[in-house]
């Protein structure tokens, strides 16, 4: 079933959301977040969960810089579409579809978009775009850090940390240093934990 397009306007975290519907939809959504005007549009979205959609042939238009990103696949969570803030310990894992945050410690927000579910246990994976010379530029090494990991990495300056579970009881914490848009592993910590632990 094809549904007609709708418009979602989100301002300062407040949104009027469309009701859940089964089948495919054409999704055309506009919102504002701390001065960033964004438009998300796709002609083929399919409900993965009640309020989580997988969208093919997606266009994300960033109006202030007049840039449009074309993605084969992007995911949109109707309740948690966009986050603008730090990727620290207070960040809520696995919720937000679009994230504006300073990833490389240069004081300027970069862009993170959920494009898959290649994280640990089918969790989200992302495309990372660093802001350079007035545009968001895709960064493959950073994007690869979101595959197979327990959550999106945490950022402290140019230091990134991310966790990955191996089997039932081994938890690995990786620390990377970001320099010239490339990542270098500087530390790996491993601990054995109980299967009931949040880490495992």
For each feature predicted by the language model, list its residue ranges.
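Repeat-based blade/solenoid architectures
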Residues: 77-96, 144-152, 196-197
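Acidic, small-residue rich beta-repeat scaffolds with periodic aromatic anchors
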Residues: 18-66, 150-200
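Acidic/hydrophobic-patterned starts of short beta strands in beta-sheet-rich repeat architectures
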Residues: 104-115, 158-161
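Beta-propeller blade repeat segments, especially FG-GAP/WD-type strand-to-loop junctions
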Residues: 62-66, 121-141, 174-180
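Beta-propeller fold detector
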Residues: 72-75, 138-143, 185-191
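Short glycine/serine/proline-enriched coil/turn segments at secondary-structure junctions
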Residues: 118-122, 167-168
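Sec-dependent N-terminal signal peptides
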Residues: 3-14
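Structural signature of eukaryotic scaffold interfaces centered on beta-propeller domains
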Residues: 30, 97-105, 153-154
């Amino acid at each position: 079933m094809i549904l007609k397009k709708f418009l979602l306007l989100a301002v300062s975290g407040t949104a009027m959301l469309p009701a859940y519907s089964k089948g495919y939809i054409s999704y055309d959504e506009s919102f504002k977040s701390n001065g960033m005007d964004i438009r998300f549009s796709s002609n083929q979205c399919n409900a993965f969960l009640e309020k989580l959609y997988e969208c093919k042939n997606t266009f994300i238009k960033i109006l202030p810089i007049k840039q449009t990103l074309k993605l084969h696949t992007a995911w949109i969570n109707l309740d948690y579409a966009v986050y603008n803030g730090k990727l620290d310990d207070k960040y809520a894992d696995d919720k937000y579809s679009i994230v504006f945050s300073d990833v490389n410690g240069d004081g300027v927000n970069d862009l993170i978009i959920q494009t898959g579910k290649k994280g640990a246990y089918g969790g989200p994976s992302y495309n990372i775009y660093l802001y350079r010379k007035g545009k968001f530029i895709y960064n493959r090494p950073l994007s690869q850090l979101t595959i197979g990991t327990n959550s999106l990495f945490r950022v402290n300056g140019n230091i990134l940390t991310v966790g990955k579970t191996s089997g039932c009881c081994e938890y690995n914490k990786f620390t990377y240093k970001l320099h010239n848009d490339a990542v270098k592993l500087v530390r790996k910590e491993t601990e054995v934990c109980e299967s009931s632990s949040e880490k495992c």
